[in-house]
């Protein structure tokens, strides 16, 4: 896919839902205000159980591959096989904006091989959580948990709350909520 030129584009990828998360919508608005010419692509497709869903998702992976190959930045909110399992160009910036607030429960490499975790061999074959440039964490306190879960060292951790948390500290949002109550 390196045949296609890289554009002024950011691609958001999610397996959590078939629609944009609130965090993605808030980022989209903020980016549009700051850089209206930047193309934003949203590839949101929930990976469901069942063979037909998985076959359908395989076709979606090709779409992901194209947009990842032609983007300067990719933002994820969960594991993405197209990012992790395939070789990426060095200039690609991949940001893991994990969908959960904080690290209350264990996930990723923290539970590989355990009951609720992935099989260690599968995690290795699918290069689970590879090729990330930055991993967003809500605080320095959570950073070691995220580093363990994603298998990265501290230099990849960036303390930055999710956009929906920023919304809670926005006075106009609070005033609007009070008016509606």
Task: Describe every region a protein language model picked out.
Residues 25, 53-118:
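Extended catalytic core of nucleotide-activated donor transferases of GT-like folds
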Residues 9, 37-39, 93, 134, ...:
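Residues at the starts of beta-strands that form the adenosine-phosphate
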Residues 105, 110-111, 117-181:
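A nucleotide-sugar donor-handling region in carbohydrate enzymes
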Residues 16-19, 47-49, 80-82, 100-103, ...:
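Short, solvent-exposed loop/turn segments at secondary-structure junctions
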Residues 39-40, 72, 130-135:
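Short active-site oxyanion
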Residues 43, 77, 97-100, 138, ...:
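Generic beta-sheet signal
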Residues 1-63:
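N-terminal pre-catalytic "stem/leader" segment of glycosyltransferase-like enzymes
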Residues 20, 42, 94-98, 150-154:
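Tryptophan-centric aromatic hotspots in well-structured domains and transmembrane helices
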